[in-house]
């Protein structure tokens, strides 16, 4: 009887261990996916920052070209 009870406990512990191992495996996979998404988001952010810097530089060039001569400046609006 005592051996039978021990075997039932062993089975319950083994089932619980398997369940916990599956959960850890799932969490590791989720963490990997989140890490990859974060890395991709950082790359996109860096590209967007570079694009914004370039566009602001181009805008500055256009402004300089438009207002190169003071005569060409539009009158102030009040």
UniProtKB/Swiss-Prot annotation:
InterPro entries annotated for this entry? SlyX
Q: Output the Gene3D superfamilies linked to this UniProt entry.
A: 1.20.5.300
Segment forming the signal sequence: none
Taxonomically, which superkingdom? Bacteria
- A Pfam family matched by this chain, by name? SlyX
Family membership noted in the UniProt record: Belongs to the SlyX family.
Q: What is the protein's given name?
A: Protein SlyX homolog
Q: Which organism is it from?
A: Xylella fastidiosa (strain Temecula1 / ATCC 700964)
Q: What is the lineage of its organism?
A: Bacteria, Pseudomonadati, Pseudomonadota, Gammaproteobacteria, Lysobacterales
């Amino acid at each position: 009887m005592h051996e039978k009870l021990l075997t039932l406990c062993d089975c319950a512990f083994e089932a619980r261990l398997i369940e916990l191992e599956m959960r850890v495996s799932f969490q590791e996979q989720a963490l990997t996916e989140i890490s990859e998404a974060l890395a991709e988001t950082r790359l996109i952010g860096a590209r967007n920052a570079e694009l914004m810097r370039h566009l602001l530089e181009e805008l500055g060039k256009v402004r300089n070209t438009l207002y190169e001569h003071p005569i060409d400046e539009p009158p102030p609006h009040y």
